[in-house]
Structure formats: structure tokens, C-alpha cells
Amino acid sequence: MPANKVISTVPLLLLAAVVGAAVPKPLDPVMVAPHIYALDFENEKVRVIRQTVRNGETLPLHAHPDRVMVYLQSCAWLEDDGAGGEHMQLFKIGEAVWAPAETHGGTTANVAQECKILEIELL
């Protein structure tokens, strides 16, 4: 590649890097639902977010990478079973659960009490 072409593409690459870094992730739970999710820690390998689920709140559409969820208190809520029925989900304080990457939201929480969860996302 001629030197003048390399020099002319460098500003475009720098501009793309700056603009790309400034664009927020559209489905980042911390960005779309700061009243539910709070960032506790982040580096290049993991991100730790704290989730507070309250009865009657509707989670907006958001996405997670693979993660481990640690329940900071006992939690119970009803979930749709996909066949027109519901089943109760129960988690004990300190219980750790693997959750694969997913995009979800748009459902209203039906919890017995406020539920706090620490989510350790693998980046």
C-alpha cells in the first residue's frame, strides 16, 4: 500500500475508534435499567453487577454474556413455563447459579419480596 494511502487512512481509523468508544452498548443492563442494575466492578475479564428485582417492575430488553448469579438473599418468584402455566423459582441466600448468555426483558417481575442478586459476567 502506498505511504500516502496509509497516512490518509490513519485519521479515519482514529475517528472510528473514538466514535465507537463513545457509543453506549444499546442492550447493556446498567445503561437501560440503572434503577435495577448497578456496576460494582469491571475489568477486561469480568464485570460484576448488582441487580435488585422488585415486584411489579418491568425489565426493559437487555443482554448478558455468560455469567454466574449469586443470590444475596432468599428469593422466590413466579415464572411463565412457556406452556401457558407458571412455576415457582426458589433460590437460597448464597446460592450460585450458572446462566448462559441471553437477551431478555419485557416481562414484569412477580417476586414474593425484593430480591438482590450479584451477577458476575464473563467477558
Feature annotation, model-predicted:
Residues 64-83:
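Glycine- and acidic-residue-biased ligand/ion/polar-headgroup-sensing regions
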Residues 84-101:
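Short acidic-glycine-tyrosine-enriched beta hairpin
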Residues 33-58, 65-69, 120:
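A short glycine-rich, His/Asp/Glu-containing loop-to-beta-strand
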Residues 1-11:
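Bacterial N-terminal signal peptides that target proteins for export
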Residues 14-28:
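Bacterial Sec-dependent signal peptides at the C-terminal "C-region" and cleavage site
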